[in-house]
């Protein structure tokens, strides 16, 4: 489902021409625990932050992207890596390495997605599930530059059938598509259009808790935002 979201965003950039200059993404960790951000760039876009790095509590890291950059960011949790960068994460793992290169995060994972251009399109997506509170805030810019994200900790309200647990604790919340693999939850087959794929009771749990985040594949109207000539702050645990 994440690939569907990136493809949609990539098409959106055709509505605007490329702006000059660069965009700065500042990743901020307000969690009480270390987060290992992963980055995945779209076709033709440069890799940011070597694909992944460590972000300690209270730390921030700026990453500079070209004006046509597209891709996504996510947070990995409970990771352990050796000196060569090999290891694993309990949530959001990207192939047992610190630097994700061209591997996306293993669901369930909260995603911050971007396609930059004359108009930047951005969203926070829970289509692939949830693992870390996450927000995107535009810095400067003009347009519909509202903050997108999921501030709530969905692990505390995740339905039991979607819960991912470790040592008796809920550590992530799966999407209904991942949990049940049916067309009505995955928006595939006979349910593969906005007209035939409606919000489910599970996506409504996500939407109620996080009204500016994507809760299912066709949740565009209240979940995609546009801004021009802005930089962006991506915050893990924004309410902390």
UniProtKB/Swiss-Prot annotation:
SUPFAM superfamilies: Osmotin, thaumatin-like protein. Strongly expressed in pollen grains. Also present at weak levels in seedling roots, in sapling stems and in developing male strobili. Residues 1-20 form the signal peptide. InterPro entries: Osmotin/thaumatin-like_sf (IPR037176), Thaumatin (IPR001938). Induction: Weakly induced by abscisic acid (ABA). It comes from the Eukaryota. Keywords: Allergen, Disulfide bond, Pathogenesis-related protein, Plant defense, Signal, Stress response. GO terms for biological process: defense response; response to abscisic acid. Disulfide bonds join 31-237, 79-89, 94-100, 145-227, 150-210, 158-173, 177-186, 187-197. May be involved in disease resistance. Belongs to the thaumatin family. This is Pathogenesis-related thaumatin-like protein 3.5.
